[in-house]
Amino acid sequence: MHRRALLTALAAMALAPAWAFHALPEKFDPQRDAAADVQQALALAQAQRKMVFVDVGGEWCAWCHIFDRFVAARPAVQKALQDHYILVKVNYSPQNRNEAVLSQWPKARGYPHFYLLDAAGKVVASQPSGELESGRDYDEAKLLAFLRRHLAAQ
């Protein structure tokens, strides 16, 4: 019985998407090495023929949490991100502004701010999140259009 459980677990791991196993941050963490996280995301993007979705913000940012909840509740958005992007969170807070990484890209005009990078690290899009909002939430159609519009750079 133990052998069967082990084989089942191994089969499940083999079939699961690769994004499920990398150690990129799920939260904004001022202690993380943002440069290393972005490099890891780029390596994964190259290996998987995807782009990188960089989410810049902080645990202090209400709209950052709204975005996380929005994505978690929208299967179409989750699918678009999982199919075409490696997601990486880069902290911006008084504890760590990650200036070395963020100075390489267009200046953010608020948070969260989204950058799309091709697998070589070139900025394909720099998007203030406010343009993707609708009322007190995000607009699914606007977000999906943003994600799809830049896939040609892949």
Segments from the language model and where they lie:
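Short active-site neighborhood of thiol/selenol oxidoreductases, capturing the structured segment around
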Residues: 49-59
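The canonical Cys-X-X-Cys-His
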Residues: 61-65, 114
